[in-house]
Amino acid sequence: MASAVDLAPVPRTADESTVSTAPSLGIGDVLRRLGHDQKSMWGFPLKAVRGAHAKATVPFVATTIALVVLDSHDTPYFRRTSRFSTFNRDFSGLKTGLAEGLLPVAVVLTGRLRHDSYATDSAWLAGEALLDAEVIAEVSKHITLRLRPSDISPTGDFGRTWFRADFLSGASFPSGHTAGAFALAAVFSARYRNHRWVPWVAYGVATLVGLSRITLQAHFPSDVFAGGVLGGVIGHTVGTERLGQTGP
């Protein structure tokens, strides 16, 4: 997989916009690529420590730290209010999780019914990015073991949350739902970037998913920010690898 911080859109030449040179993807291709993806992503922190990609890494780390500091001040409001009950019902963790998992499947089936290999490949890439993002998120959660806001009483201490969660019950940092949502949004935005409405809708829905994780008290704002950035970078990197294909 390409560098996780190579965020510049890949330009398409006139030949690339009309000729597809890459064979269509399948589930076997995605599974084979996952190992390479994960090796590349888990090697990134070591490169960052050595000073590589500082322009992308430093702002991300600094913003995450700032949000972590603010978590103990902003999270109690969401822990104590019931103003978001309707929104929380519409964007429950179960609903958003199912939607993320079923979206690539639906696009694959639609692409096959319409004999649209570009749509089918887009769906496989979306599934690849989703799996990559979820693996990163879940492993990170088991390393940081951060309590969820819902694990803390409304009048409790929201400042002492790290390395206190039960290893088997689930932890908070980063948000897996948000990482998955932004990974999907980034893939489809890259693949269908000629349709100006796609990025607006894709990233708009992903943002709503991220906000719901805060109002549901499943995550702190810093968890959501970190998950969104990680998912977005992963999705963009995966989604721009095959832009030489013929697309809409």
Regions found by a protein language model. Give the residues of each.
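N-terminal targeting leaders of membrane proteins
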Residues: 1-96, 100-114, 142-143, 150-171, ...
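Non-cytosolic membrane-interface motifs at loop->transmembrane helix junctions
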Residues: 82-89, 121-124, 226
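Small-polar-interrupted transmembrane alpha-helices in polytopic inner-membrane proteins
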Residues: 63-67, 128-142, 199-213
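Membrane-helix interface segments
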Residues: 83-84, 118-119, 194-198
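Alpha-helical transmembrane spans of integral membrane proteins, capturing the lipid-embedded, hydrophobic core
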Residues: 57-65, 101-105, 126, 130, ...
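Membrane-embedded catalytic cores of phosphoryl/pyrophosphoryl-handling enzymes
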Residues: 153-248
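Interfacial segments of alpha-helical transmembrane regions
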Residues: 51, 56-57, 113-136, 199
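Juxtamembrane helix-break-helix junctions at the cytosolic face
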Residues: 110-117, 188-194
